[in-house]
Regions:
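Membrane-embedded beta-strand positions of outer-membrane beta-barrel proteins
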Residues: 20-24, 52-54, 66-68, 116-120, ...
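One face of beta-strands
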Residues: 7, 22, 75-79, 148-150, ...
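Short loop/turn motifs that connect adjacent beta-strands in outer-membrane beta-barrel proteins
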Residues: 14-18, 60-63, 108-115, 158-167
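Outer-membrane beta-barrel pore domains and translocons
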Residues: 1-2, 12, 25-27, 69-71, ...
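Transmembrane beta-barrel domains of outer membrane proteins
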Residues: 8-14, 23, 53-57, 104-110, ...
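Flexible loop and strand-edge segments within Gram-negative outer membrane beta-barrel domains
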Residues: 29-49, 57, 61-116, 122-145
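Hydrophobic, lipid-facing positions within transmembrane beta-strands of outer-membrane proteins
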Residues: 3-9, 18, 48-52, 97-103, ...
């Protein structure tokens, strides 16, 4: 079977100055063995994800935006799916936990000829895996990655620079 359940909701204030959107998903799929040989052609999947995005207008031409998401996913293929992977003849198994988010501030002049953006974001990934055969205890692995990014951008729009409209981005 393959069961996929989703949820989405959004709300914006009457003034339009603030809003939030949330989502969630849960998926469960059984492993599929097409030819009956005891080995899956499609792996077991169990995943859940949740997240949100919100904004707040700090002025007529400025806003703060925040975003966050979490994903948790387990996959297992091979044979003997109810046993630990090192007890199977062939097994591929991954278990991920991923968190990410961002925060940004945008401001512009009334005519949008001057725009400024500052942002920061992150993603944290934790992964446990097994890729092995013949009951190999050394086929387990783990990975942990943290990614950070931050920056600023300024854009000035010229109605005419030399002979045509242009934008300068710094």
């Amino acid at each position: 079977y393959d069961n996929n359940t989703m949820l989405n909701a959004s709300i914006v204030s009457e003034s339009g100055r603030a809003g939030i959107s949330v989502f969630g998903q849960s998926r469960h799929r059984s492993g599929y063995d097409h030819d009956g040989d005891g080995f899956t052609e499609l792996p077991v999947i169990s995943s859940q994800s949740v997240g949100m995005r919100s904004f707040f207008r700090t002025g007529a031409y400025s806003r703060i935006t925040a975003q966050y998401h979490h994903i948790d996913e387990y996959r297992r293929g091979g044979d003997l799916l109810k046993q630990p992977p090192h007890e199977a003849f062939v097994a591929e198994q991954t278990d991920h936990a991923i968190d990410g988010g961002s925060l940004s501030f945008d401001i512009s002049s009334a005519d949008r000829s001057n725009r400024f953006n500052a942002y920061a974001s992150f993603q944290n990934t934790a992964r446990k895996s097994y890729y092995g055969s013949k009951q190999d205890l050394d086929a387990y692995g783990t990975t942990h990655d943290l990614t950070l990014a931050a920056g600023m951008q300024y854009v000035h729009a010229f109605r005419k620079l030399l002979f045509m409209p242009s934008e300068l981005t710094l």
